[in-house]
């Protein structure tokens, strides 16, 4: 069973059918941290990302690193803390549907993951420009942009030399509260690639 780290907002509903029983560890690194083991969230983003992964490969274990608060606020250093935590929890892949400025600590966290042979997948961003966001633009990160329903780059998808591949990013069904909604963004393109990589790892280990 492949273990996957999700560096994001935490989990809105741990009993949602898409993820129930799959979370094996979690830590709160966000700016609004109250308790270090509190990975709960009133926003759905992290759970939505997790549900995209499990829709592709249900046979996974999830490690949750909460690095963003309700408003989506975080720092490169909280993201770095989340990545390091997921590596140390034995994850083979880490999904980062977060984007922000660079920092030395974040760069070192990516290098640490690479040294431990952990694959980091990151969303390119949603500004439709050539802006460089991080961790997406660090070397050896699998950077994912969004494609539309025709397979072309979606207008909102950040595009630059950092982008390695595209995945569908329009009208993706994701977990929300007790049910689902359809949402759009590179945040949901990245976990499609994460899920597919997990299938490859699973098949290679047989």
Question: PLM features: what roles do these ranges have?
Answer:
Residues 18, 140-143:
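Glycine-centered tight turns that cap/initiate beta-strands
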Residues 1-61, 81, 88-89:
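Active-site core segment of subtilase-fold serine proteases
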Residues 48, 65-140, 148-153, 159, ...:
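Substrate-binding/access-modulating region of protease and related hydrolase catalytic domains
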Residues 12-13, 29-30, 55, 59, ...:
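Active-site/binding-pocket entry motifs
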Residues 53, 65-68, 169-206:
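Hydrolase catalytic cores
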Residues 63, 119-122, 142-143, 166, ...:
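Structural detector of well-ordered beta-strand residues that form the stable sheet scaffold
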